[in-house]
Amino acid sequence: AGNIIVKEGELITIDGGSGKVMKGLVPTVQPEISGYFSTIMSWADKFRKLKVRTNAETENDSKTARKFGAEGIGLCRTEHMFFDENRILSVRQMILSKSRQDRDNALSKLLPFQKNDFKQIFKVMSGLPVTVRLLDPPLHEFLPKNSKDIEEVARSLNLGIKEVENRIFELHEENPMLGHRGCRLGISFPEIYEMQCEAIFKALVELKKD
């Protein structure tokens, strides 16, 4: 301990229970509900009144939650869907757009992704309740933080680096927990919520047809 050097790019494994850090990729197994705990939980299910729902925003998380007995999704945070590498550029394009038309063009690229996200989740939940939270955090959280990413965004959107930096500065908030977020964001940019609602309803319609 104390004399091991880990270089950038090397894999490590962290035991979340003990805090132990191990060099390299340690084989893992998926936890199972078994033994006495499984028996006690089955007894509890016969008498409990409380229903337990999960936080999930991906198909895999939804499957895991169902496996462990979740009876729906209590919070599906849609902002997590926007950080995926194959859609973050469209999100940034939407944020940096100067006109409603440009924003709509960027949102039209995001619509199929959102629809597919919701469709997968609704399919796994198979009729169980799903509470979807529309885009909540301040927009600056989706913008690049370092010069390399700023240059990449500026180049891909045909904007000047200074222009992108100025927009990031304009959107930055000292206390984002109380700032331009949630319903305030929806009032300022209703087209974002319109796209998300359209994605939800289209996902439901397609599932019904399937």
Feature map (PLM): residue ranges:
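Flexible, glycine-rich loop/tail regions that form catalytic "lids" or insertion modules at the edges
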Residues: 51, 61-210
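Acidic, glycine-rich flexible loop/linker segments
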Residues: 1-76, 80-94
